[in-house]
């Protein structure tokens, strides 16, 4: 922001003089030498260059989306309570409170809203923002805020001493401030048009909180609880309650504790009363919604069975579908039991090593048996009987040819046997005839 600007500075024509040494035309000057000569001159542009650009944006922006600043009347009621409200806070403004409110108003988006710069005002045309929007924006905003605070303090003094009926005086003062800001607040954009979900609770709108709780510092926990408690509620416009008294400091402290203790698990427990009222007495003409059941996380085992490509192919026939399903389920259960038995990664590593060792032993035994069977087959073939280095393919081919030759010889011998049997029968009959003739 510009240097040498304060709330007591009323001569806005001299604002440019304070920053005039920063700007120069084509004249070459030694600014650092001037600074050494004159102690009253502000620092050079290179030393304090970023402070020149800390100005408020001139064009008006949209209203703030924060829950504490979305409704200006609520903020006014919470911050300017009657003088007798010792519990609610804010009777006589201290210097710290005034500085905090002014800083919040100037730091947020509310300076650029229509309730500060009213276009219907006659002084708006002669405003110094229009005359010089580059250097006098902060001064004009400070002037407007100070005038607004002075008018509120004068209105509070006119109300007189507080009566014993503190609630009535609170309502009258709040209604007075709301009447002052109601036409300006109506010009703001309705947050329900921008947000699909309402910022307040769906069951009943809460009264505006005091500045100690959440008026100027809205927490993300409250927004989270409101959006998660009613995610399917229809968007409703924010309603300004004129007769709602400000809450006490004890209520605000309890609300702060509730908001600080919010976590992911207890978000759904924030609105028990609203859910009870909806379940007991639903409004007429509306359909009752089923209660949202909380999500339950269940543990499930993902089967990661891999095929052993090193194992020999199975020569047995395929099992039926039912038997195959039983075998698969048995494998899954066995894997689950094995996973449960593995208590630590060290034990799982030892089990894997044992399985690998047993697999290697079985594979070695299988290869040795296959080699012995080939050697036995080679010994049965006459051509390869003495050839110890005969490959397995030659052994198989010679064995096949030898088997075929042996089978052919077998058939030949069987036919010869049949002929000999017939010859025997004939000889027996002939011998019997000779015996009968001799007798």
Curated annotation (Swiss-Prot):
bHLH domain boundaries: 354-406
GO terms under cellular component: cytoplasm; nucleolus; nucleoplasm
Annotated spans, Disordered: 201-360
Keyword vocabulary terms for this entry: Acetylation, Activator, Chromosome, Cytoplasm, DNA-binding, Glycoprotein, Isopeptide bond, Nucleus, Phosphoprotein, Proto-oncogene, Transcription, Transcription regulation, Ubl conjugation
Span(s) of short sequence motif 9aaTAD: 100-108
Record field: compositional bias (Acidic residues): 251-263
Residue spans of biased composition, Low complexity class: 210-237
One Pfam family this sequence matches: HLH
Protein known as: Myc proto-oncogene protein
Gene encoding the protein: MYC
């Amino acid at each position: 922001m510009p240097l040498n600007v304060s709330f007591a500075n009323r001569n806005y024509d001299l604002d440019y003089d304070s920053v005039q040494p920063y700007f120069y035309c084509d004249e070459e000057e030694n600014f650092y030498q001037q600074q050494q000569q004159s102690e009253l001159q502000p620092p050079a542009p290179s030393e304090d260059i970023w402070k020149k650009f800390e100005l408020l944006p001139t064009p008006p922006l949209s209203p703030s989306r924060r829950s504490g600043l979305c409704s200006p009347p609520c903020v006014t009621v919470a911050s300017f309570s009657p003088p007798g409200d010792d519990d609610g806070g804010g009777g006589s403004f201290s210097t710290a409170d005034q500085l905090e409110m002014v800083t919040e108003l100037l730091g947020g988006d509310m300076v650029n809203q229509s309730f500060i710069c009213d276009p219907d005002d006659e002084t708006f045309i002669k405003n110094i923002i229009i005359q010089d929007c580059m250097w006098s924006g902060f001064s004009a905003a400070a002037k407007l805020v100070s005038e607004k605070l002075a008018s509120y303090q004068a209105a509070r003094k006119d109300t007189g001493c507080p009566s014993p009926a503190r609630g009535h005086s609170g309502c009258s003062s709040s209604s007075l401030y709301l009447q002052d800001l109601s036409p300006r607040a109506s010009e703001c954009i309705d947050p329900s048009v921008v947000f699909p979900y309402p910022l307040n609770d769906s069951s009943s709108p809460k009264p505006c909180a005091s500045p100690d709780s959440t008026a100027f510092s809205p927490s993300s926990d409250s927004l989270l609880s409101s959006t998660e408690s009613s995610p399917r509620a229809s968007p409703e416009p924010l309603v300004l309650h004129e007769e709602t008294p400000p809450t006490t400091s004890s209520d605000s402290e309890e609300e702060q504790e509730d908001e600080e203790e919010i976590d992911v698990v207890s978000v759904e427990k924030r609105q028990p009363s609203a859910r009870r009222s909806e379940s007991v007495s639903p409004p007429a003409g509306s359909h009752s919604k089923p209660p949202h059941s909380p999500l339950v996380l269940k543990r499930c085992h993902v089967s990661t069975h891999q095929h052993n490509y090193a194992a020999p192919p199975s020569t047995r026939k395929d099992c039926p579908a039912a038997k195959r399903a039983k075998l698969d389920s048995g494998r899954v259960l066995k894997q689950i039991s094995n996973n449960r038995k593995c208590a630590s990664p060290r034990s799982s590593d030892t089990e894997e090593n044992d399985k690998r060792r047993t697999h290697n032993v079985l594979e070695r035994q299988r290869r040795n048996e296959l080699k012995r069977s080939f050697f036995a087959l080679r010994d049965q073939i006459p051509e390869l009987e003495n050839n110890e280095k005969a490959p397995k393919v030659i052994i198989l081919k010679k064995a096949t040819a030898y088997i075929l030759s042996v089978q052919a010889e077998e058939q030949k011998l069987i036919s010869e046997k049949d002929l000999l049997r017939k010859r025997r029968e004939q000889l027996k009959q002939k011998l019997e005839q000779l015996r009968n003739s001799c007798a």
